[in-house]
A protein has these predicted regions:
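Short loop/turn segments that flank or connect secondary-structure elements
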Residues: 1-3, 7-135
């Protein structure tokens, strides 16, 4: 039996109690095109054969799914835009390192408060960082 040992009774990832986005998504994936994305079913990555139909929204079970999807999309294309800008400018390794550190500090080290929604704070921060990096 090739049953995934990490699936719980509901056949969902049981590795992490809050099921991070990547775990919630599996066995789905995202196909990014034209500044958007769509969900795809990864059939070769999951050995389970008796799959049942379920709506993506129900499978993901993420509060405020529309805002979450906007966040995922904005973040993905922000990173792509920064990478393209650095390539176009033929940025040095030192410049790339400085920008990576700046992005890490702004989005991972600088906290997000609880008084305002994460998504609103992220959007504001993304706008500020884009103004600096993508002039």
């Amino acid at each position: 039996d090739e049953h995934c040992i990490f699936l719980n009774q509901e056949d969902r990832c049981g590795i992490h109690k809050i099921r991070p986005g990547f775990c919630r998504l599996f066995p789905l994936g995202r196909l990014y095109e034209d500044r958007s994305f769509k969900y795809i079913l990864q059939t070769k990555e999951c050995v389970k054969t008796d799959r049942q139909k379920i709506k993506v929204r129900k499978w993901l079970d993420i509060p405020e799914l529309d805002q979450y999807e906007k966040f995922v999309n904005d973040w993905h294309y922000f990173l792509k835009d920064v990478a393209a800008s650095l390539k176009k400018e033929n940025a040095s390794d030192g410049t790339i390192k400085q920008i990576n550190i700046y992005v890490l500090k702004e989005f991972y080290m600088r906290g997000f408060g609880e008084e305002v929604s994460f998504y609103a704070q992220f959007e504001q921060r993304l706008k500020e960082v884009k103004a600096v990096l993508l002039k």
